[in-house]
Amino acid sequence: MEIGTPLFEGAKKLLWLGGGELGKEMVIEAQRMGVETVVIDRYDLAPAMHVAHRKYVVNMHDGGAIESIIRKERPDAVIAEIEAINTETLSKIEMDGIKVMPNARAVKICMDRIELRRFAAEKVKVPTTAYGFATSPEEVKKMCKDVGYPCIIKPQMSSSGHGHEVIYDESQVEEKFKEALTHARGKSKTVIVEEYVKIDRELTVLTYRYPLSSGGVATKTIYPVEHQRPQGVYHYIESWHPATVSQDVISKASEYATKVVNELGGFGIFGVEIMIAGNRVLFNEVAPRPHDTGLVTLVSSDISEFQVHVRSALGLPTPDVKVVTPAAAHVILASGEKWAPKYINVDKALEIPGVQVRLFGKPVTYNERRMGIVLATGNSVEEAKEKVRKASALILVS
């Protein structure tokens, strides 16, 4: 393979649909490899736009606009960084010979909880919580009786835990159904109703596929990342690497992740979410891209999840990824709305040995928006976790 020079004829070019913090890290990895980079997002000054060669600001559901930009740029691959995109456009450009990462079908399945649950539980046959689907409060009541109270409902499409509602008894059904749908993406009025389990541990199995020079495909897993969310919080807060669970759990989680990812196909890295509840190891969801909990691999691994995805997009191999040190990551969250925020006490956070701070450069804050992340290495996972908790508590967003 030849890699040309950016902005000249023969350059390799990658285009991202979505320019958040995950996209930013991927663009940086692509820049390190001499790749021309293009980012599309719904708002200007998105994090990945700061480091890309070119940017476009469009409605991410406007299939015509997205398609026209992709046809103009003719990238070597299109990388879906977010799920809130027009999947019909991805299928169309893929049929016209433009590579979509990991593939258009996988993106479509992964952004739709109902399609994904049917795919995982009924086609791939990996263990999940008991579940059902509903389109009205009456149907939710029936499903809740089937799976048992308490149960949890989620919109068919949403991200970062938005719209996840726990129902403890029948009197809450109408209110929780309405609340779930207020966070739904698109026009769907369908929810998934799931058995509520007490989660003891949560893992992300970063699983990736790349083409072999012999013509085959290799599927590999990185030693799992562990993460936790406080009770009632459904978005990412903290992760650490390597996971501190038994080898039996690691084996089952890796087996389920490999099955799901091989059935989805394509190339690149997938973040497969696994829940551990008592002696049950359960598939939860999968992201068809680098995972937010995998930000910790920026310091824990010899090759980050972002570099793995970029390599696969270019058709390059990643034979192995090794965990080189215990590490942890903790988010920096905003409170309230503000334009052009400032960050206080970064210097104090960096006085802690082994700590790094990554500020994403988002132009606007809103309550609980992820604005940065603290990373730390240590002699143990517990030491690294203590460092990131202390450092993240010092940093204020104002």
Curated annotation (Swiss-Prot):
Top EC class for this record: ligase
Swiss-Prot/TrEMBL catalytic activity: N(1)-(5-phospho-beta-D-ribosyl)glycinamide + formate + ATP = N(2)-formyl-N(1)-(5-phospho-beta-D-ribosyl)glycinamide + ADP + phosphate + H(+)
Molecular function GO terms recorded: ATP binding; magnesium ion binding; phosphoribosylglycinamide formyltransferase 2 activity; phosphoribosylglycinamide formyltransferase activity
KW Ubl conjugation (keyword) present: no
Domain ATP-grasp: residue ranges: 118-314
Gene: purT
Organism whose genome encodes this protein: Sulfolobus acidocaldarius (strain ATCC 33909 / DSM 639 / JCM 8929 / NBRC 15157 / NCIMB 11770)
EC identifiers of the protein: 6.3.1.21
Pfam families: ATP-grasp (PF02222), PurT_C (PF21244), RS_preATP-grasp-like (PF22660)
GO BP terms in the entry: 'de novo' IMP biosynthetic process
Ligand binding (Mg(2+)): 273, 285
Entry's family note: Belongs to the PurK/PurT family.
This protein's name: Formate-dependent phosphoribosylglycinamide formyltransferase
A GO cellular-component term linked to this record: cytosol
Alphabetized NCBIfam families for the sequence: PRK09288.1
UniProt pathway annotation: Purine metabolism; IMP biosynthesis via de novo pathway; N(2)-formyl-N(1)-(5-phospho-D-ribosyl)glycinamide from N(1)-(5-phospho-D-ribosyl)glycinamide (formate route): step 1/1
Entry binding sites for ATP: 113, 154, 194-197, 202
Binding residues for N(1)-(5-phospho-beta-D-ribosyl)glycinamide: 21-22, 81, 292, 362, 369-370
Residues spanning the signal sequence: none
Subunit organization: Homodimer.
